[in-house]
Each structure stands twice: as C-alpha cells, then as structure tokens.
Regions:
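Divalent cation-coordinating acidic motifs and surrounding scaffolds
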Residues: 1-202
Length: 202
C-alpha cells in the first residue's frame, strides 16, 4: 500500500481494537461501495466496523474529510469516481476526541465547510453533515470526561462545523445509550435532501 496510506484515502481493511480486520472486497474495484454491490448490507457492515481504538492518535476526522474530497493529490486518486455531481454528499463522523487546534486537524470549521461546499460546486443544499461526538460542554450532557474507554472530550470545533450547515447538519452525543434516534433523524434528513436535489447539468 505504501504511498496510498494516509488520511482521506478511503476505506482500507479496518484496523484497531474490535475492527473487522479484513478486506471488505468492494465490487466497484475502488475504495467505496456503489450500486453494483451484490450484498450491500454485509459489505457495509464490514466497512463500518472500524473499531473502538484508533491506531493513529490524535484522531483528525476533519483533516481526513478535506483530503478525501480534495480536487488533486493521492487521496483524490484513490477515491476517483466517489464524488459525483449527480448525487448528494453525506458526511458522517464519529469520535470521542475533540478535533482541536493544538493536535487535531489543520484549518478551521469555516475552512472545512468551504472545502465541502466547493466539492459540490457551491451547492450547499446538496450536503448533509452528521456528527456523533462529545457533548460535555453542553447543558444536560450525556458524556463524562474521557477516561480510558469511557466518556469523551468536549468538541466545540466539531459542533461549530455541524451547526454551520443549519438544517442540513445533525449532532448527537457519542455517549448516547443508543444511536437509533440519531440515525432515524438522519435518514429523514437524507430523504428530504434527496427529494429536493436537482442535479446540475452534466
């Protein structure tokens, strides 16, 4: 894999504690699933089992996102064909760490958003952003402090990023007992966004 390793380069065999630890063998031949996948449920389950322990601390989800949608570079080459102008783009991130300025992703919430909007040719209505992260800095927080395998770090930069998308952004607590309500709300938003999406002329 050599030069193809690094943030933003799509799914590789999920590694780390409780990860699937195997190549999910996407039928697309790329690092993403598409409509040609014969068993989407099983393949998604394989790719989504990313584990509970990061092999590369600190986590930098926003830096990975920006690299994945960049118009050029190694990550762009690895993800070729994934970003389509005839479809909406749904970004989902799940982390118990704050993507802070000191040791987290480069840039700012405003810059991360600008990168996403640019990837969709300026059509912010074609984006949905979903985030599960620490809520310790909010009233009625579910998370306690991050200690070993419990709790989370407060995530003001991640919250600012999601909130900047208004009705097209949904936040939830990484420490919630169930993510069911979060994803049920997300599915509704994705459907509404798809229904209202008008693809640009090709």
């Amino acid at each position: 894999q050599g030069a193809l390793r690094g943030r933003g380069r799509g799914v590789v065999p999920p590694r780390g504690l409780q990860a699937s630890q195997k190549d999910c063998m996407f039928s697309s031949g790329g690092r993403y699933m598409d409509v040609s996948e014969p068993d989407l449920t099983s393949t998604f389950a394989c790719a989504a089992q990313v584990g509970t322990g990061s092999t590369d601390d600190p986590e930098k989800p926003m830096q990975a996102m920006v690299a994945a949608i960049a118009p050029a570079g190694d990550a762009h080459d690895c993800n070729l064909g994934f970003l389509r102008q005839d479809a909406i783009l749904v970004v989902t991130f799940i982390t118990d760490e704050d993507d802070n300025f000191g040791d987290g992703s480069a840039g700012t919430p405003e810059g991360w958003k600008a990168s996403l909007v640019a990837a969709k040719k300026g059509d912010e209505e074609a984006l949905v952003v979903l985030g599960l992260y620490g809520d310790n800095d909010q009233q009625n927080a579910v998370c306690g402090p991050l200690v070993d395998e419990s709790g989370a770090e407060p995530s003001p930069r991640l919250r600012q990023f999601v909130d900047s998308f208004g009705d097209h952004g949904i936040s939830g607590s990484i420490c919630a007992q169930s993510y069911g309500p979060f994803f049920a709300q997300a599915v509704g938003l994705i459907k509404t966004t798809c229904d209202g999406f008008i693809p640009p002329p090709m």
